[in-house]
């Protein structure tokens, strides 16, 4: 029973570390760079650039819209 618990705990830690490493090369999409919007919506006129390649949002259904 203890072995299963330790394996489960190890799996949770490894998945968490993998999620962190996935965004290590990107900055969080936030002020002053941009704002996160739903992927199906267009970026607003004052933030027309879709900069999801450089910035990430916490929700996978969002994209980052940045200023020019």
Swiss-Prot record:
Its main location: secreted. GO terms for molecular function: toxin activity. The keyword Secreted applies. The keyword Disulfide bond applies. Residues 1-24 form the signal peptide. One of its GO terms (cellular component) is extracellular region. Keywords: Disulfide bond, Nematocyst, Neurotoxin, Secreted, Signal, Toxin. It is found in: Secreted; Nematocyst. Contains 4 disulfide bonds. Belongs to the Cnidaria small cysteine-rich protein (SCRiP) family. gamma subfamily. Induces neurotoxic symptoms on zebrafish. Has also been claimed to be implied in calcification, but tests on homolog proteins suggest that proteins of this family have a neurotoxic function and not a calcification function. This is Small cysteine-rich protein 2. It comes from Orbicella faveolata.
